[in-house]
Structures are given as structure tokens and as C-alpha cells.
Amino acid sequence: MDKKLKKYIERYDLIQNCANYELKPNGGMIVLINQETECEIVIANSVYALASFQAVLINAYEVSVDIQANRALNLIAIRFKGAGASFFYEGEMERLMQMPKAPIFIEKNILENELDSYFKNRLTASQLPFNIMKIIDLLDTQGSDYNIDEVMAIANIPRKILDKIFNLRTGLSFKTYASLSKLDY
């Protein structure tokens, strides 16, 4: 894998020689590329058909995603770090937030031997506004516990950037804000 892509992509997994496969949760989004066999993706008891040579973007998930076919599968699973997929599929992020449990069908005919060049061509600087609050809201609606370090990992944002933006928005550093919020009135 190209060095530049390693910042956003955890790894490429080949899924072959089996008719059923279970994708374990990893905390990041996944692009699933079907290289050959028509199959079904089962997410939260909903079934989605995946045609030959079709690719889908699957949101981060808490329970396993099952893949089923009548013959041997031939898939590639691209596992992203945190919100790394948003740098490649920014246009799909709004749909993904509206339907977080449904896969987003993205493209056809992505070839295994051209993955690095495909992702290098798709890589763009994010134009989305700073959206940590959107992530916190999503975690709240799912009833998840979280801390700021987990949110930053999901958003793929370094602590230094968060501190700078927090200071710009509030006029205070985290340390000053924390000491003020502990004062009893």
C-alpha cells in the first residue's frame, strides 16, 4: 500500500474461497469490492444484494456484518482508520449519516491491482466543516459512552487541531475551560 494512503487506510483484506464470511467490527468504515460472485450482505437483519464488480461503503458498525453467496466469494475489504473514508468519499458522508446501517453503493469495476492508484485519485482534502459535534450527537443517539480521545479517533483529528479549534470557537483553552466548569456557584 502507498505510504500516503496508510494515514487513512488500515489494510486491504482478501475474502476468498468461502461461501460465507463474517466482517468483525473494527471501529472504522469499510469499502467492500465484489470481484466476481453475486452475494448478499446482511447488516442488522437487513439483506442487501451485491452484484458482480460492485463496490459498497459500509459505515462503522458494532455487530458483525455477514456476507453470503451460493459459491466461493471473491471480495476485497478495504478497512479505513476512524473516519478515513471521508477523505475518499466525502460526497457520500451525508447519505451515510442519514442511513448509518445501510450500505452505500458507490461504483463498479474497481480492479484489485489498481487499488492504490484508485484511492490516490480519490483522495481529497476534506471540505466538510469541523464535525466533532456531529459525531458526538451520533454517539448520543446510539446510546454509546465516549470520551474525547475516542471521538478524535473516529474523526481522525489530532489533539493539537482540536485544541486550536476549541480555542478559536470558545476563546479558552481546554485547561482553562475545565477549571472554570469545576467552579461551584
Regions of interest found by a model, annotated:
Residues 149-183:
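Basic/polar phosphate-binding segments, predominantly the helix-turn-helix DNA-binding elements
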Residues 96-101, 179-185:
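Short, intrinsically disordered, charge-balanced linker/junction segments flanking boundaries
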Residues 1-149, 155-159, 173:
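Alpha-helical bundle regulatory/interaction domains
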